[in-house]
């Protein structure tokens, strides 16, 4: 495991103009052990970051720079808040220089390169790094590997909720692995900061719709991790929805209890599994989570319900898709990689109303 440092961690961000990029900036600008040294954007080269994002005035004094101008190999770690394919094109040079990489896109999430190529329509650029130097960045399940890795594939937002919602059940083999359902809702910020008809206010406001029902890129990521936990194939129906809020995610997960597991105390199971996890809150029995209770925080809340004490178990999970579902989780990974307490720079309380 990386040892705690005497100096601040030199951090670069590639792709700092999107929603996950600015969320990284918000969190890292308040991190006591971080020195922001480079924030790249080819389009915004020379523009002060605070001019694009006024909330960062007085906190981030850097200007965006074109990628070729930034000395990324001088950084201790570089975050990629970029489209798929960008991080893997630069990972070889960065890791060769001793710089660690945390990718918030999908380049290092899937270990199966054939699956990656099928879903993302591009060949994998560095399969050797993927196989030998990378780790899937879901800290609560993968601490040892993350601490040693040179490259982290930061999990997708939907996968974070579904995997953590099912992990205690799959680890103990308590549910039918062929009958899993994940009914998930995300705020529109999950679509990114780009001009797109579906994200326009007139399209997204007062509207609720499903998308990606025939196949979503997060499906293979979820199933790959669930199958590791289950020790075999799983059958998952995953349906994402877009809801008219800016940030937040609510996943309702359905699982059928196996006959031999009917006497299990599922509330106690979840409480014990996540005891001591700083960012996972298993709510009291009978409680129901709300997205606003985690807004702008790195917390993920879980509630477990068993209607009528029957054979159907319902796991309800909420998170902020931009924080625990993206930038906050990435900072949590960085903390672990550099021997810091996982909570460093991530103790923000959710904002209300």
From Swiss-Prot:
One of its GO terms (biological process) is L-arginine biosynthetic process. Its main location: cytoplasm. InterPro entries: AGPR_AS (IPR023013), AGPR_type-1 (IPR000706), NAD(P)-bd_dom_sf (IPR036291), NAGSA_dehydrogenase (IPR050085), Semialdehyde_DH_NAD-bd (IPR000534). Its EC number is 1.2.1.38. The active site is at 157. GO terms for molecular function: N-acetyl-gamma-glutamyl-phosphate reductase activity; NAD binding; NADP+ binding. GO terms for cellular component: cytoplasm. Keywords: Amino-acid biosynthesis, Arginine biosynthesis, Cytoplasm, NADP, Oxidoreductase. It is found in: Cytoplasm. Pathway: Amino-acid biosynthesis; L-arginine biosynthesis; N(2)-acetyl-L-ornithine from L-glutamate: step 3/4. It catalyses: N-acetyl-L-glutamate 5-semialdehyde + phosphate + NADP(+) = N-acetyl-L-glutamyl 5-phosphate + NADPH + H(+). The keyword Amino-acid biosynthesis applies. NCBIfam families: argC. Catalyzes the NADPH-dependent reduction of N-acetyl-5-glutamyl phosphate to yield N-acetyl-L-glutamate 5-semialdehyde. Belongs to the NAGSA dehydrogenase family. Type 1 subfamily. This is N-acetyl-gamma-glutamyl-phosphate reductase. It comes from Bordetella avium (strain 197N).
């Amino acid at each position: 495991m990386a040892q705690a440092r005497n100096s601040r961690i030199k951090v670069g961000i590639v792709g700092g103009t999107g929603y996950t990029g600015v969320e990284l900036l918000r969190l890292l600008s308040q991190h006591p052990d971080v020195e922001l040294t480079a924030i790249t954007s080819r389009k915004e080269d020379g523009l002060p970051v605070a001019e694009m994002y006024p909330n960062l005035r007085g906190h981030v004094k850097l200007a965006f720079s074109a990628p070729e101008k930034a000395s990324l190999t001088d950084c201790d770690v570089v975050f990629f808040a970029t489209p798929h394919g960008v991080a893997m094109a630069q990972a070889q040079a960065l890791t060769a220089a001793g710089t660690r990489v945390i990718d918030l896109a999908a380049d290092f999430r899937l270990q199966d390169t054939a699956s990656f190529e099928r879903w993302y329509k591009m060949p994998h650029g560095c399969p050797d790094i993927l196989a030998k130097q990378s780790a899937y960045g879901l800290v609560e399940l993968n601490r040892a590997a993350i601490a040693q890795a040179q490259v982290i594939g930061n999990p997708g937002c939907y996968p974070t909720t579904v995997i953590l919602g099912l992990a205690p059940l799959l680890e103990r083999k308590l549910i039918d692995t062929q009958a899993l359902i994940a009914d998930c809702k995300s705020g529109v910020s999950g679509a990114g900061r780009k001009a797109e008809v579906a994200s326009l206010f007139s399209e997204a406001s007062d509207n609720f719709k499903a998308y990606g029902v025939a196949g979503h890129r997060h499906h293979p990521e979820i199933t790959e991790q669930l199958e590791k936990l289950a020790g075999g194939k799983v059958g998952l129906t995953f349906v994402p929805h877009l809801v008219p809020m800016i940030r937040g995610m609510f996943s309702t997960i359905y699982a059928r209890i196996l006959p031999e597991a009917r006497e299990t105390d599922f509330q106690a199971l979840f409480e014990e599994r996540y005891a001591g996890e700083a960012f996972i809150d298993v709510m009291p029995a009978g409680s129901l989570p709300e997205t606003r209770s985690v807004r702008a925080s790195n917390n993920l809340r879980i509630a477990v319900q068993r209607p009528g004490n029957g054979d159907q178990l319902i796991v309800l999970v909420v998170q902020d898709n931009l924080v625990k579902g993206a930038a906050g989780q990435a900072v949590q990974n960085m903390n672990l990689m550099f021997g810091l307490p996982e909570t460093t720079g991530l103790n923000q309380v959710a904002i209300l109303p």
